[in-house]
Amino acid sequence: MSLEDDVIAIIVEQLGVDPKEVNENSSFIEDLNADSLDLTELIMTLEEKFAFEISEEDAEKLRTVGDVFTYIKKRQAEQ
């Protein structure tokens, strides 16, 4: 599985959405109907999966699925 597939699988599981609804441009709040608790749980799951901490400041910037793809790729390149 690619990074994108892994992230989408986590989003689908955590938010209970249809995989067809999830794409790079999907907004967590507007398109996927996530609330703040959903987003907190999603961030925690991403941290566990990819083995790094996401600061609260960085987490607030992750508004779309594409933002998460970009952030994780950047963090992996830094490791």
Swiss-Prot record:
Q: Which keywords, in A-to-Z order, does the entry hold?
A: Cytoplasm, Fatty acid biosynthesis, Fatty acid metabolism, Lipid biosynthesis, Lipid metabolism, Phosphopantetheine, Phosphoprotein
Which residues does UniProt assign to the signal peptide? none
Q: Which residues form the Carrier domain?
A: 1-76
Q: Name one Pfam family in it.
A: PP-binding
The UniProt record lists the keyword Phosphoprotein: yes
Tell me which residues bear O-(pantetheine 4'-phosphoryl)serine. Answer: S36
Among the GO molecular function terms of this UniProt record, one is:
acyl binding
Subcellular localization: Cytoplasm
PTM note = 4'-phosphopantetheine is transferred from CoA to a specific serine of apo-ACP by AcpS. This modification is essential for activity because fatty acids are bound in thioester linkage to the sulfhydryl of the prosthetic group.
Please give the GO cellular component terms listed in this UniProt entry.
cytosol; membrane
Pathway it works in? Lipid metabolism; fatty acid biosynthesis
Specify the superkingdom: Bacteria
Q: Does the record carry Isomerase as a key word? A: no
| GO BP, sorted A to Z | lipid A biosynthetic process
Which family does the record assign? Belongs to the acyl carrier protein (ACP) family.
Q: Which PANTHER family match?
A: ACYL CARRIER PROTEIN, CARRIER DOMAIN-CONTAINING PROTEIN
Functional description taken from the UniProt entry = Carrier of the growing fatty acid chain in fatty acid biosynthesis.
Q: Which HAMAP family match?
A: Acyl_carrier (MF_01217)
Protein name per the record:
Acyl carrier protein
What is the species listed in this Swiss-Prot or TrEMBL entry?
A: Chlamydia pneumoniae (Chlamydophila pneumoniae)
Q: What is the lineage of its organism?
A: Bacteria, Pseudomonadati, Chlamydiota, Chlamydiia, Chlamydiales
Q: Which gene encodes it?
A: acpP
